[in-house]
Structure formats: structure tokens, C-alpha cells
């Protein structure tokens, strides 16, 4: 017990020595107002970055804000814009026109083609592929699969 008392007293004295000056510094900082960190050791470049960030935040045309200029207003009124005013090259314009032509093509990509054979097959129902040119082995596999499916003692049946 005798050794603990001096240590506790030393800790209390050190705490008082460190806490009191820190508290007075905070009070002085609050009295001064806005602090850009010059007292904390910010460099001049860091201060300049902070000022630029403040200026950007107050800019009405800053990031995240929509700009409305004369060109944009006119483009909204016109509708489709092929980019001639923005300086698209001839090849870019040709690509855009080709893409529009493909999109309007009734037999373009993603559209189902219906010919006479498909229409007839849909009317008939099951087709074993003889008209499409299935080989004998493919036809045999299909017939075996049908036979297994109709077997009363086949897989999945008790």
C-alpha cells in the first residue's frame, strides 16, 4: 500500500498539468472564432485546398448542379440530336444512322423471324426434327426419351 500512494499522487499531478492547458487552449480557440488550422500546423497548400473547396461548394454551377445554357435549352426543344453542333465526325453520324436503321428493321436482332415452316410446325404440335434434318441417332435419342417418359415404372415413379 505504501508504494501505491506516491504513484497515484504522481498520476493526479500529471493529469492536472495536461488537462488544464488543453482546456484553456480550447477556450481561446472558441473566442477567436473560425480556425483554418494555421495554429494546428496546416501548411499553406492545405489551407488553399480548403479555400478552394469552400469556393466550389458555393459555386452555382458546381458539381451536382444542372447547367442550363442556350445550347442545352435549344436541344431539349428539338428532340433528337445527331451531334452535328457538338462536332461529331461523319463516321460517328453514319454509325448513329445505321443503329437507328437496325432498330427499326422488323427482322433485326432480338426479333423472332416467322417463316412458313415455323407457322406450320406450331399448328402441328410435336415435331421430331425430320424436316430440320435430325440424324438417325438424334431421332433415336428422342424416341427413347419419350419411351422412358411413358414408362409406368420409370425414374421418379413408385
From Swiss-Prot:
Region (Disordered): 101-120
Propeptide intervals in chain numbering: 25-32, 64-78, 110-124
Entry annotated with the keyword Oxidoreductase: no
Main localisation: secreted
Species assigned in the record: Doratifera vulnerans (Mottled cup moth)
Role according to the record: Probable toxin. Does not show insecticidal, antimicrobial and antiparasitic activities. Does not induce increase in intracellular calcium in mouse DRG neurons, suggesting that it does not induce pain.
Positions of disulphide bridges: none
Other comments on record: Is also classified in the limacoditoxin-8 (DH31) family.
Keyword tRNA processing: no
Signal peptide: 1-24
Protein name per its UniProtKB record: U-limacoditoxin(8)-Dv66
Stretches for region 3 X 46 AA tandem repeats: 33-158
Lineage: superkingdom: Eukaryota
Sorted UniProt keywords: Amidation, Cleavage on pair of basic residues, Repeat, Secreted, Signal, Toxin
Residue numbers bearing the Proline amide modification: 63, 109, 155
